[in-house]
């Protein structure tokens, strides 16, 4: 309906981009893209669970605020923060390394491959299996597959327009679609 500009409203359903698994993968992609969105970084710092506590997150934010830097920059420099204990550092560093590896992959992967790498490298599906029923995990997997299809559509649309698909461009398009989905046509 959106493709043909037909106004519609979902009753009793949930906007695709408001689903937990879609918000999670988008937060990973935003963090890979530039790390400027502190909320995105905070959303995924414990997805899947890494044992990073709220106190550590608060201390990172305080350091970021005091030094006028982003939350991500504070996270990268966590070893320089006196109030962050070694035990917390040992949990933060693998997360920073993971994002670094995914950023390196962005250089030579398609966006589809990058999105799949996020799901695979983070162990996202496996982590869902620990807390949800088989049916819930399968529904989330199907939503992630649909997201991958949307990424492929974005890449194909760019190629048809003679443009290079970029992660920033994908995220901008998703933001626009999310805004359109939230419009009230009544």
List each language-model region with its residue ranges.
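Conserved helicase motor
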Residues: 11-19
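Conserved helicase C-terminal RecA-like lobe
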Residues: 2-7, 19, 26-186
